[in-house]
Amino acid sequence: DRICTGITSSNSPHVVKTATQGEVNVTGVIPLTTTPTKSHFANLKGTKTRGKLCPKCLNCTDLDVALGRPKCTGTIPSAKASILHEVKPVTSGCFPIMHDRTKXRQLPNLLRGYEHIRLSTHNVINAEKAPGGPYKIGTSGSCPNVTNGNGFFATMAWAVPKNDNNKTATNSLTVEVPYICTEGEDQITVWGFHSDNEIQMVKLYGDSKPQKFTSSANGVTTHYVSQIGGFPNQAEDGGLPQSGRIVVDYMVQKSGKTGTITYQRGILLPQKVWCASGRSKVIKGSLPLIGEADCLHEKYGGLNKSKPYYTGEHAKAIGNCPIWVKTPLKLANGTKYRPPAKLLKER
């Protein structure tokens, strides 16, 4: 007779790493990881996802919308998640802006981080009667409005001295910027200043010297001195060539808090303000958004969660996402592999 000891077994290609025994062969495993492939970005399942700030504002960049360029004002949909599709927002097509002087490019990204965003229906300041006035409100042929007349950004008023009596140099003037949002939101107040060559500065403001500007709100104070001249003629988005430039900035005012702006000639006084509340998770991505996905991943786009873990590129992700691991994980669902039993000697 032949007597065999052991258990029934077959060759096992499955190896798992254990905490106590190192690598162990087992009879069966369940893979716990997947390696995603790149896909388009999508709407996040179970929540509203925002792509462009104003989807119905045609031919408008997010910076156009944030500054209130004529023809670029509309409703910004509420969203719990937002796609940062302009990593470095492109210029606004209304008037040449000196982007390197300020944080104006960050404004669309700041707004994107809020769940609810709306533009006020009223102006925060009566610009015509502001200190140093009376002023007429300047417009530009580079900013055509809905009737194709000259216009300017809805968030700012270009304060040009109204007559020769006040078209003179001035010491620093200060205007208080009240809080006008009605639901306790953060108030994002946009302001700026215009500068040009010496001839245009004298023509518009009666002073060709560099002008000083300061804003202060929520414990943050910012100072500027304008640059006079040295600008080549520049046209934005097919508009009229401009010898001047504008510098745009913003300040965030918390509920009930007043801000201040100290200025000389060339001020762009704040007008309509953004009222923003809630938080929206922001992730770098691309448009358009196609379909739905469990997870949005900066490197892979929209992912549907098929496994609890993933390998590959590690990057920011939002939603119901698998967890990144360096190496594949397996769950043993069989027994420890034993080699085929050896025959005992015949008796």
From Swiss-Prot:
Membrane topology: Single-pass type I membrane protein
Subcellular location: Virion membrane; Host apical cell membrane
SUPFAM superfamilies hit by this protein: Viral protein domain
Main location: virion
Modification after translation: In natural infection, inactive HA is matured into HA1 and HA2 outside the cell by one or more trypsin-like, arginine-specific endoprotease secreted by the bronchial epithelial cells. One identified protease that may be involved in this process is secreted in lungs by club cells. Palmitoylated.
InterPro entries: Capsid_hemagglutn, Hemagglutn_HA1_a/b_dom_sf, Hemagglutn_influenz_A/B
UniProt keyword Disulfide bond, yes or no: yes
Keywords: Disulfide bond, Fusion of virus membrane with host endosomal membrane, Fusion of virus membrane with host membrane, Glycoprotein, Hemagglutinin, Host cell membrane, Host membrane, Host-virus interaction, Lipoprotein, Membrane, Palmitate, Transmembrane, Viral attachment to host cell, Viral envelope protein, Viral penetration into host cytoplasm, Virion, Virus entry into host cell
One matching Pfam family: Hemagglutinin
Glycan attachment residues as annotated in the record: 25, 59, 145, 166, 304, 333
GO biological process, one term: fusion of virus membrane with host plasma membrane
Function according to Swiss-Prot or TrEMBL: Binds to sialic acid-containing receptors on the cell surface, bringing about the attachment of the virus particle to the cell. Plays a major role in the determination of host range restriction and virulence. Class I viral fusion protein. Responsible for penetration of the virus into the cell cytoplasm by mediating the fusion of the membrane of the endocytosed virus particle with the endosomal membrane. Low pH in endosomes induce an irreversible conformational change in HA2, releasing the fusion hydrophobic peptide. Several trimers are required to form a competent fusion pore.
Subunit structure: Homotrimer of disulfide-linked HA1-HA2.
Misc: Major glycoprotein, comprises over 80% of the envelope proteins present in virus particle. The extent of infection into host organism is determined by HA. Influenza viruses bud from the apical surface of polarized epithelial cells (e.g. bronchial epithelial cells) into lumen of lungs and are therefore usually pneumotropic. The reason is that HA is cleaved by tryptase clara which is restricted to lungs. However, HAs of H5 and H7 pantropic avian viruses subtypes can be cleaved by furin and subtilisin-type enzymes, allowing the virus to grow in other organs than lungs.
Family note: Belongs to the influenza viruses hemagglutinin family.
Protein known as: Hemagglutinin
Organism expressing this protein natively: Influenza B virus (strain B/Finland/151/1990)
Gene name in the database record: HA
